[in-house]
Swiss-Prot record:
Gene name of this polypeptide: GABRA1
Activity regulation comment: Allosterically activated by benzodiazepines, the neuroanesthetic alphaxalone and pentobarbital. Inhibited by the antagonist bicuculline. Potentiated by histamine.
Glycan attachment points: N38, N138
Residues binding 4-aminobutanoate: R94, T157
Identification of the protein by name: Gamma-aminobutyric acid receptor subunit alpha-1
Membrane topology value: Multi-pass membrane protein
Annotated domain remarks: The extracellular domain contributes to synaptic contact formation.
Amino acid sequence: MRKSPGLSDYLWAWILLLSTLTGRSYGQPSLQDELKDNTTVFTRILDRLLDGYDNRLRPGLGERVTEVKTDIFVTSFGPVSDHDMEYTIDVFFRQSWKDERLKFKGPMTVLRLNNLMASKIWTPDTFFHNGKKSVAHNMTMPNKLLRITEDGTLLYTMRLTVRAECPMHLEDFPMDAHACPLKFGSYAYTRAEVVYEWTREPARSVVVAEDGSRLNQYDLLGQTVDSGIVQSSTGEYVVMTTHFHLKRKIGYFVIQTYLPCIMTVILSQVSFWLNRESVPARTVFGVTTVLTMTTLSISARNSLPKVAYATAMDWFIAVCYAFVFSALIEFATVNYFTKRGYAWDGKSVVPEKPKKVKDPLIKKNNTYAPTATSYTPNLARGDPGLATIAKSATIEPKEVKPETKPPEPKKTFNSVSKIDRLSRIAFPLLFGIFNLVYWATYLNREPQLKAPTPHQ
């Protein structure tokens, strides 16, 4: 006969079930436990990496050359100073190299760290050769990023603002183009110890953000990269170079300088259409335009460095100044011939009237009597005595030849000079030809995108 299960059997069954469920719950760690375990593992990895690590020694010392791969992301380019020949650039500067001492094994493949870890390991001593002032951003914390992969490859990124030199050749100003370089390399390590390479192909090694241009007077045409070797007294060093190609915008200078110069030259030629007797008006035109050109030439040079050669704008202003000054000289020449009374270069409108010649007097017996004029005495008729006296007193006139004087040159009034007529055609024609040649020469020049490579 089978025995029915008792109370003790049910109790044992419940105890077994609870123990099974409890064992499963203990076998699955909570999220807090997982985070605690990851932090512990992370700390142990970092401690193990820095254990015995000497950041004074470069990777591969005595075995191989340390290769540093670089690339640049430009967040802001500009402004550019023509007077100081420099430019300002804001970049994310990335460097990557391999350090076998920092290999690790763990649940993660990449260690994402900040600037605190960067100060405890070896980093390249990169500096900018043509930098006047470089600033590493530290607000609110130093803007530095460090990544370490499990094979010991490091990525080190910094945000920098660099003010660098930009040598400019201003012969074609303001239709000029420039290649502003950014040169960097190792300060202490020669190419036998540290070499630099671009991370990607040249077209992608330096990238400028689409909204990164901060230029008012230039267009950023593009950038090119290069590398070379620089020889110094301490050895040969690898230098990485990036050229930013700029083309100046001419609109500002057309409004500020070129149009005023052209209008001033045209204004000086208005005097050719005034009568040459209008001395005050033509004098005002000449003197005013000369002074205006002098002011324009001085103001055009204020924004440029004091270079020892003439720029394209200087040549334009000089030619305009020559036209204005020539117009003043032309008026002086016309006025000179007008005052001398020469009629060879004008039309005589009012002929000169002949002068009356007075009768000459002949002195006779201490008295003066006209020689060519006889007077009929008004004598009373029928008085023979008076008639005899009058007859004896009459003086026989002598024939006197009139004096002949050389004809004086005719003076002209309200006339037009032949010099003015010629100037009305010659001056505008020559000025138009000059502008055609000037603008065709400078505007058709293509900017040189290839900059000189560093000395090797």
